[in-house]
Amino acid sequence: MKIVLAGGSGFLGSALSRALRRDGQDVTVLTRSPAPTTTSDPRLSFVPWTPDGTVGTWASAVNGADIVVNLAGESIAASRWSAAQKDKLRESRILATRSLTSAIRQAARPPAAFVSGSAVGYYGDRGDETLTETSPPGTDFLAELAKD
C-alpha cells in the first residue's frame, strides 16, 4: 500500500511511519522541513509541503495514494499556551486539513481513505468519569481545538 503521512516527523507520526514500514507499506511523509534527498529505507520518501490551506506540487503524492493520514499540527507541548500560541495550534491544524482535503478532492485518483487525528483532549478532563465515543465533547481549550 502507498500511504501519505502528514505530520510524519512528529511524536505519533514517526512511530506510525516505522510501524507501517515494518508491515511492508510504502510511506511518503509530507514535511515542512527540507526533505532529505536520500533515505536508507526504500519504503520511505519525503515530499516538502507548506500546509497553508492551498494545494501545491506536493499534491502529486496524494494522487494515487491508497490512504492519506493527517497528524499534522504545531506541537501541543512546544510552549506555553499564550493567546498567540493557541492561535498557532488552531491554525496549523485547520490549514493542514484544508490543504489535504483540497488535494484529495482535486486528485484524479483519490485515496480510498482519509484518516485525520484529533486528540483525547476532545473529551476534556472529566476526572473519574467513564468516557465512550458517544460522550459529549469537553469545553476546555483542547476540546475546542479538536472540534475545530
Task: Describe each region flagged by the PLM.
Residues 36, 43-96:
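NAD(P)H-binding glycine-rich loop region in Rossmannoid oxidoreductase-like domains
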Residues 139-148:
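Active-site Tyr-X1-5-Lys
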Residues 30-36:
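Short, polar loop motifs at secondary-structure junctions
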Residues 86-88, 98-140:
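Conserved Rossmann-fold NAD(P)-dependent oxidoreductase catalytic core, especially the SDR/UDP-sugar
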Residues 3-23:
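N-terminal Rossmann NAD(P)H-binding glycine-rich loop of SDR-like oxidoreductase domains
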Residues 2, 66-67, 113:
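Structural motif
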Residues 27:
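Short beta-strand element of Class I
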Residues 6, 30, 71-72, 114-120:
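SDR active-site strand-loop-helix element
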